[in-house]
Amino acid sequence: SSLWLHMGAWGPRRVSTDDTAIVSAPFKTVNNDYSLLDASDLVFIDAPGTGFSRIIDKEMGGSGDPKEFYGSDEDAMAFADFITQFLNTFNLWNSPKYLFGESYGTYRSAALSYILEMGKGVGLNGVIMLSQILSWDNIADLAQANPGMDLPYQLALPSLAAAAWYHHKLPDQPEKLDPLLREVEEFSMGEYAMALSKGSTLDSASSAKILQRLHKYTGLPETYIRKANFRISGPLFEQNLLANNYKVVGRLDTRFTGYSMDPLGKQPDFDPLEAAIFSVFIASANNYIRSTLRFGQDMTYHPFGEGVGGNWDFRHRTPGMPHEIVGNVMPDLARAMSYNPRLKVMLNMGYFDLATPYYEGIYEMQHLPMDPALQKNISYAFYKSGHMVYLNVPSLKEMHDNVAKFIADTH
């Protein structure tokens, strides 16, 4: 649902957060000094089956079928239909228009930009992304299930280094983060990429050199790195960085920590960020909607898709391709930007995010299949926060100012 952006970032009221602190009920909401209402009107759309939206199926007297909505392409089309109907209803066709997506919402926004621009005649001024993922092949969580595809390990490594730096686990702890990240980025796409490409033919001298560098950048023991075959996935890192303290670090935000439920396990049983903030947001949103807005008294607000689970169809028909593939909307965004060369794109990424590592976002943007001249239409902003950048209030203020300027500069 949209409650995270609504109650965490851009709405007129927001959940009071103290960065990584864990709080207990009663939770507080405060006036949001960083709402984007000073820069734009805001329309929060809950995907079908989330929030108060319901799919009216036969049991409810309708003819709706979850299969019509629970899929990458189906979801994007539902959003496109809603947006065009909204423009009709409120006569907003001539207004500047922007998409803002967070996490999966960035994937949706890329697909949606193509549908709106080339299928619906809706000209967009900008697409704003927070914590981007446009290709599932690049995700650090799933790397072990896709042997031979080593790119996710390279793209995640700078974020692993950021986490180890934050928790003071680096053997040679630098004072500043940014120079470290530039060094790791260069290593990831250079020596590390070359070593991984050699697979089982990597010689012992090169192995020792790569092993030493990975230990330097992650703080993990060399024996563990060797057992992992130099390929450190997100879950393995989250489980092992603070293993000596019987703790795990967050996936969505590696600054968050929690007690390990299975110290001998391969991956954490839960995400400490989820444990820290999900109940806070859900309780606060329900209280605000029902007490202040006086809406939904007899309804259940679903923060996540009710009954979606494993029923989501990740297949996507890439523009210009005859067959569906699983999960890559980079061509969609590239075609939208090529069709409308005035369309601007903004990326906002947190350094401590392992769900969608910041360098993966950079890589995807730099590899969009379009004329390189259009790269000038892409801008980047990075924050010392995680997947939900807005949990860190200084980062929220910084992101507000960056996004507000982007909007002002593009209409």
Language-model-detected regions and their locations in the chain:
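N-terminal cap/lid subdomain of alpha/beta-hydrolase-fold enzymes
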Residues: 1-68, 366
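A catalytic-pocket lid/entrance helix-loop region that shapes and gates access to the active site
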Residues: 8-17, 117-219
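Alpha/beta-hydrolase active-site loop
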Residues: 47, 67-88
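Alpha/beta-hydrolase fold nucleophile elbow
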Residues: 92-104
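Glycine-rich nucleophile elbow surrounding the catalytic serine of serine-hydrolase chemistry
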Residues: 101-114
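Short alpha-helix in the alpha/beta-hydrolase fold that links the catalytic acid
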Residues: 111, 230, 343, 357-367
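Alpha/beta-hydrolase fold catalytic core
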Residues: 200-355
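Catalytic histidine-centered segment of alpha/beta-hydrolase-like enzymes
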Residues: 384-395
